[in-house]
Amino acid sequence: MNILHISPYVPDVHANHAGGVCMGKQVETLKKNNHVTVLTFVNNEYEQGLIKNHPDYYYVQTSKGSFVKNAISHLNMPNMFAIRNSKQFRDLFIKLIKEKDIEVVHAEFTAMGQFVLIKDMFPNIQFNLVEHDVTIQSYQRQVQDSKGLKHIYCLAEYNKVKKSEAMYLSKVDHVMTFNQKDANLLKKNYSCNNVKVLNPYYGIDFSESNTIDKIPNSICFVGQMGRNENHVAAMRLIRIFKKLNQKEWKLTIIGAYPKQELLDQESENIHITGFVDDINKEILKNEIAVFPLTYGAGIKLKVLLAFGLGLPVITTSIGAEGIDESGKVLCLAESDDDIANAINELLSNRDLLKQVSQKGIEFVREKFSWNKTETIFKELYQ
């Protein structure tokens, strides 16, 4: 089939964030049996470098100015959708559909669902949307956790998201999620009955062996630090770590675009990496991973990544969503004290550490095989 893959970020299995990695794997898989054209946004200097590895990709360059202009021009849309409402992108989108004789659009992230309106111009085209998370759920949590003017803003955005997401989902041919819980949420909130559940790709090839030495008594957090939910969780973990008062222990916050507040926490036993070339190697230096997330939505690929790399993971119920919500292999902890106790228990018991590590690897291999996604793609695109 002739497929047009559209995304808000550059798809690449070597991207520095989980969404980009997962999209890159989808493109690779789709290309095995189809003619795939990729159209994406390039959002920063890092992605400018990334796009050079893909001379066959079509793209539109964004800037802070273009984001502001688009947001102001489309006040009826939630900001995160409005910034992608680009005339340049839309014109190129239409041009490629015509030139490449596109039969199916494969869109990533809810914001790209707005381009489903292309079906008014091309009624025979199929439009499939991958919901990396259920956007309305994320905004519900922000409304609950905010106060004052921020609460008013979040509530207004929530209402716009609900209206926009409902409209997009009513028009698409198929919706894909990365876990059954998100599929159930779409059915509950929007009466979606055309949902397929994929397994996400989180960046691990289990055929590769690693010989990276662990730093004794080391803890890590992983995430794109420009995202507020990751920043808040990292700052929370630092507070917990400081209260543990273990001078021989090390904490590493791994991820690009850390805010100054986070950078200011750098000390003898707290390290803020910023961007790293090989995130897997950086994670593997550590003995455990901790994700004290308080909001966000969808499956947390960073949790799967750490888990699959053999690190025992301590996280909240939000971090466990779509992975192991009953805590069979994840260590679930909600309060700061519970998280601190879980860290102490793991780092003070080497046998338990090894046992949980092996269980995690086996769990990810069994439950999150990419083969399931390959099968679904073959069914959809034949």
Label the predicted regions.
Residues 197-266, 272, 276-277, 284:
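Conserved catalytic-core segment of nucleotide-activated headgroup transferases in glycan assembly
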Residues 329-337, 345-350:
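Conserved acidic donor-binding segment of nucleotide-sugar-dependent glycosyltransferases
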Residues 126, 155-158, 162, 166-208:
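Donor nucleotide-sugar binding/catalytic pocket of nucleotide-sugar-dependent glycosyltransferases
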Residues 1-57, 98-100, 242:
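N-terminal subdomain of nucleotide-sugar transferases
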Residues 284-298, 309-311:
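Acidic donor-binding loop of glycosyltransferase active sites
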Residues 302-305, 312-315:
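Short hydrophobic beta-strand element within catalytic cores of glycosyltransferases
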Residues 66-79, 128-163:
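Acceptor-binding helix/loop patch of EC 2.4 sugar-transfer enzymes
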Residues 351-381:
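A charged, aromatic-enriched C-terminal amphipathic alpha-helix characteristic of glycosyltransferases
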